[in-house]
């Protein structure tokens, strides 16, 4: 018997390439009944999932930001309905973590939506699928948002932004990190990121040993610090292979279930790529 699939796709994902690539599903799910639904900025995930029938399956198509919005807007009871994920974003870090490569494979999202960590920023609590981060990566997202406001069609070069920040523009800070009640203090901090998976930021393997399927549901927090900016840039460039952890004095990783990160001056925070400005602390409960 043919199955019924409701294909939700974000046309803005993958630098707007998703609206064409989504129709690869015609071949992947051939001989099934497919109904394509375009997700606008005003799209009501909660109402949509409330109305999904027992014989229907949902395919969520987009990037990590699409998953982030989905898990935070849908009623908990509706997250048990059959939901699959088809990666069509520009970073696709969730897919990179659970599947390892970008191909035509559907991922069963139901396996990954339970026991997600919660982050509190400025009194607002959200789930996150990949990470929450203070520091230069949040600053990069802030700069990228400003570029989009001026030139919406211009591709964003995050690597270029990060290089300029590491060498010249980003101002280091002091940080206090509390992990399951134990307090740590760090100077010359560029980054303090708490992760559910290994990857974020379009392939940065920030915490190579983090397991999103950890039976205790622990998360990891990476503190990246350094006094000499050129050395910081050289070590930071190794984050895409995970080799940055070979510099333990600059890259410190803690693991736990309750994390609090505080900076001594306001900075941008990004949660699964969504930016919040003027933040001095965030807390995570796994």
Language-model features and meaning:
Residues 1-61, 68, 72-77, 99, ...:
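ATP/NTP phosphate-donor binding region
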Residues 8, 37, 77-190:
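Catalytic core of DAGKc-family lipid kinases
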Residues 11, 61-63, 86-88, 196:
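Glycine-rich beta-strand-to-loop/alpha-helix junction loops that act as flexible
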Residues 69-70, 93-94, 139, 270-271:
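Phosphate- and divalent-cation-binding pockets in alpha/beta enzyme and binding domains
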Residues 125-135, 139, 186, 190-195, ...:
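Short hydrophobic-aromatic micro-motifs
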Residues 148-158, 197, 202-230:
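Gly/Ser/Thr-rich active-site loops/lids in small-molecule metabolic enzymes
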Residues 171-173, 188, 215-221, 257-259:
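A generic structural signal for short beta-strands and their flanking turns/coil linkers
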Residues 181, 213, 223-286:
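ATP/nucleoside-binding phosphotransfer catalytic cores, i.e., glycine-rich phosphate-binding loops
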């Amino acid at each position: 018997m043919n199955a019924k699939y409701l294909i939700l796709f974000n046309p803005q994902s993958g630098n707007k390439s998703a609206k064409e690539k989504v129709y690869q599903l015609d071949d992947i799910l051939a001989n099934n009944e497919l109904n394509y639904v375009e997700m606008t900025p005003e799209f009501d995930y909660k109402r949509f999932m409330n109305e999904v029938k027992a014989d229907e399956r949902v395919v969520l198509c987009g990037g990590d930001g699409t998953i982030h919005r989905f898990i935070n807007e849908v009623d908990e009871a509706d997250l048990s309905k059959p939901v699959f994920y088809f990666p069509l974003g520009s970073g696709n870090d969730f897919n990179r973590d659970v599947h390892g490569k970008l191909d035509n494979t559907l991922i069963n999202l139901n396996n990954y939506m339970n026991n997600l960590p919660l982050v509190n920023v400025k009194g607002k609590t959200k789930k996150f699928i990949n990470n929450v981060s203070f520091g230069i990566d949040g600053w990069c997202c802030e700069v990228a948002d400003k570029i989009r406001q001026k030139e919406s069609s211009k591709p964003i070069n995050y690597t270029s932004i990060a290089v300029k920040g590491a060498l010249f523009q980003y101002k280091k800070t002091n940080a206090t990190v509390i992990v399951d009640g134990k307090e740590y203090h760090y100077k010359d901090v560029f980054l303090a990121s708490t992760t559910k998976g290994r990857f974020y930021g379009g392939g940065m393997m920030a915490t190579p040993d983090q397991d999103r399927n950890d039976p205790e549901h622990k998360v990891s927090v990476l503190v990246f610090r350094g006094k000499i900016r050129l050395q910081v840039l050289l070590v930071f460039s190794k984050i895409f292979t995970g080799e940055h952890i070979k510099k333990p004095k600059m890259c410190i990783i803690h693991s736990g279930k309750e994390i609090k990160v505080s900076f001594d001056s306001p900075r941008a925070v990004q949660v699964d790529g969504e930016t919040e400005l003027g933040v001095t602390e965030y807390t995570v409960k796994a």
